[in-house]
Amino acid sequence: MTASVLRSISLALRPTSGLLGTWQTQLRETHQRASLLSFWELIPMRSEPLRKKKKVDPKKDQEAKERLKRKIRKLEKATQELIPIEDFITPLKFLDKARERPQVELTFEETERRALLLKKWSLYKQQERKMERDTIRAMLEAQQEALEELQLESPKLHAEAIKRDPNLFPFEKEGPHYTPPIPNYQPPEGRYNDITKVYTQVEFKR
């Protein structure tokens, strides 16, 4: 409706002289391209060229949809993949039966040195246990002697002394250590590479 009205107005305003009208029309189209009288000429110039439509084969489209549906059904039927616990997985290199450490042949001097060292260590531990037994025996004898003296002095205190103490258990003790601790020892902070694998748990909604 608007285009027809503008076209009629343009024809009414166009002069009778053909040459003059053509010159004025060219002048108007050149310098007043955005005027209302040339509005219908701007619409085709602002539009985009038509794109060529792709021919879609309905058979191929249907096959692609069917493949996608089959893939979705397969994923839904599959059991949920659990995150593996690497601590319970034995590496294959440790399952090889032929993997054995070569036997080291010791010299006669090294064998004698180790045997003598083992004898000295056994003698040291034997003396240590003998000293511990003697110490415990002396403590028990002193305790029994003190209880007998306490019973003669006060039977009531003796009954309280031999009563079981519920706070003694559970008993916790650290040691004994085979090597003495190093005073003011600061353990070194070593460098390490974190090679822990990160797994993403995928859950399917059924």
From Swiss-Prot:
<dbReference type="Pfam" id="PF09812">
    <property type="entry name" value="MRP-L28"/>
</dbReference>
<comment type="subunit">
    <text>Component of the mitochondrial large ribosomal subunit (mt-LSU). Mature mammalian 55S mitochondrial ribosomes consist of a small (28S) and a large (39S) subunit. The 28S small subunit contains a 12S ribosomal RNA (12S mt-rRNA) and 30 different proteins. The 39S large subunit contains a 16S rRNA (16S mt-rRNA), a copy of mitochondrial valine transfer RNA (mt-tRNA(Val)), which plays an integral structural role, and 52 different proteins. mL40 binds to the major groove of the anticodon stem of mt-tRNA(Val) in the central protuberance.</text>
</comment>
<keyword id="KW-0809">Transit peptide</keyword>
<dbReference type="GO" id="GO:0003723">
    <property type="term" value="F:RNA binding"/>
</dbReference>
<dbReference type="GO" id="GO:0032543">
    <property type="term" value="P:mitochondrial translation"/>
</dbReference>
<dbReference type="InterPro" id="IPR019192">
    <property type="entry name" value="Ribosomal_mL40"/>
</dbReference>
<dbReference type="GO" id="GO:0009653">
    <property type="term" value="P:anatomical structure morphogenesis"/>
</dbReference>
<dbReference type="GO" id="GO:0005761">
    <property type="term" value="C:mitochondrial ribosome"/>
</dbReference>
<dbReference type="GO" id="GO:0005762">
    <property type="term" value="C:mitochondrial large ribosomal subunit"/>
</dbReference>
<protein>
    <recommendedName>
        <fullName>Large ribosomal subunit protein mL40</fullName>
    </recommendedName>
</protein>
<dbReference type="InterPro" id="IPR039145">
    <property type="entry name" value="Ribosomal_mL40_metazoa/plant"/>
</dbReference>
<feature type="transit peptide" description="Mitochondrion">
    <location>
        <begin position="1"/>
        <end position="46"/>
    </location>
</feature>
<keyword id="KW-0496">Mitochondrion</keyword>
<dbReference type="GO" id="GO:0005634">
    <property type="term" value="C:nucleus"/>
</dbReference>
<comment type="similarity">
    <text>Belongs to the mitochondrion-specific ribosomal protein mL40 family.</text>
</comment>
<dbReference type="GO" id="GO:0005739">
    <property type="term" value="C:mitochondrion"/>
</dbReference>
<feature type="region of interest" description="Disordered">
    <location>
        <begin position="168"/>
        <end position="192"/>
    </location>
</feature>
<dbReference type="GO" id="GO:0005730">
    <property type="term" value="C:nucleolus"/>
</dbReference>
<keyword id="KW-0687">Ribonucleoprotein</keyword>
<dbReference type="GO" id="GO:0005743">
    <property type="term" value="C:mitochondrial inner membrane"/>
</dbReference>
<keyword id="KW-0689">Ribosomal protein</keyword>
